[in-house]
């Protein structure tokens, strides 16, 4: 197997299955320069931290409940711990910074030196995979920045909805053991505030807009200039289901409304969970890419040294 040729093909095509297979095979072919999972963690690139914290936001969001009546007894709802969402955003940004720093260090310390040794300045034709590595590193940095920005924005949105769901407790009460009172107008205002302040994210310059539209699906919309906007349809359905202030419903009608309203909340949760899964997949791709790149850089460095010894 010509690992270098296979590597070039996989990187050029961004064939992540092939890259993953090469990442497994690379230690057997590339020598001591190949990076390991422990090396990644030592460099601060530990995907487990942001993914665990994002998972905690999903669990926290899922645990939020509205008040209800059970057998004539009023049961208070459950509010969200909003600090969980702040922790997740910090972890995502820190992880992205560590990923970018690793790529930039390689680009400066290794590929820069390889270009100097094997580039046109030395009269030597560089290895054909070299430019692919430079391009892939640039694309890797772009993807890292884009995913971090989008996941941070979605987490902020998630937090805003969790905040509204928590504040609903203040506007729903029991009128008696058979009826619930809802100040729907006040709740509408809270939801409208979220709609009016939905985060907007900007994809990096030169990003493949069509690829990102396919990647992110209909939970967001992406303009031709790369502005990512969250789809407000689910929030609008929640807002429009609410009655005026002071409305009194019997428990059956209230429960029917609660089920539909909470169903839209669950749909928002599913959107965010899908993105978190894609973020996890992107992190896996990054780890595999790093392992392949480290083997390629090690090979290119050895080749450059051999040229200098001629």
From Swiss-Prot:
Subcellular location: Secreted
Segments forming a coiled coil: 127-171, 250-299
Signal peptide positions on this chain: none
Pfam families: T3SS_TC (PF06511)
Recorded superkingdom: Bacteria
Record has Coiled coil as a keyword: yes
Main subcellular localisation: secreted
NCBIfam families reported for this sequence: SipD_IpaD_SspD
Protein name per UniProt: Translocator protein BipD
Native source organism of the sequence: Burkholderia thailandensis (strain ATCC 700388 / DSM 13276 / CCUG 48851 / CIP 106301 / E264)
């Amino acid at each position: 197997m010509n690992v270098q040729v296979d590597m070039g093909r996989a990187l050029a095509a961004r064939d992540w299955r092939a890259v993953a297979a090469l990442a497994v095979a690379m230690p057997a072919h590339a020598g001591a320069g190949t990076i390991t999972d422990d090396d990644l963690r030592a460099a601060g690139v530990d995907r487990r931290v942001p993914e665990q914290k994002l998972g905690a936001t999903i669990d926290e969001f899922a645990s939020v409940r509205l008040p209800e009546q059970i057998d004539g007894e009023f049961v208070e709802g459950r509010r969200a711990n909003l600090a969980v969402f702040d922790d997740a955003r910090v972890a995502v940004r820190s992880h992205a910074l560590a990923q970018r720093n690793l790529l930039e260090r390689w680009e400066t310390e290794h590929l820069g030196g390889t270009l100097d040794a094997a580039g046109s300045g030395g009269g030597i034709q560089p290895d054909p995979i070299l430019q692919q590595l430079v391009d892939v590193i640039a694309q890797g940095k772009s993807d890292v920045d884009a995913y971090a920005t989008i996941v941070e924005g979605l987490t902020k949105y998630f937090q805003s909805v969790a905040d509204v769901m928590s504040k609903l407790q203040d506007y729903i009460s029991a009128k008696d053991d058979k009826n619930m009172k809802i100040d729907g107008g006040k709740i509408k205002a809270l939801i409208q505030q979220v709609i009016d302040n939905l985060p907007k994210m900007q994809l990096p310059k030169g990003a493949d807009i069509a690829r990102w539209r396919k990647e992110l699906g209909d939970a967001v919309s992406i303009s031709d200039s790369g502005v990512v906007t969250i789809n407000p349809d689910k929030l609008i359905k929640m807002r429009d289901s609410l009655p005026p202030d002071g409305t009194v419903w019997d428990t059956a009608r209230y429960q029917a409304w609660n089920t539909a309203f909470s169903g839209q909340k669950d749909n928002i949760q599913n959107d965010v969970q899908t993105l978190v899964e894609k973020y996890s997949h992107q992190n896996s791709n990054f780890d595999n890419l790093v392992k392949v790149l480290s083997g390629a850089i090690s090979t290119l460095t050895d080749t450059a040294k051999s040229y200098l010894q001629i």
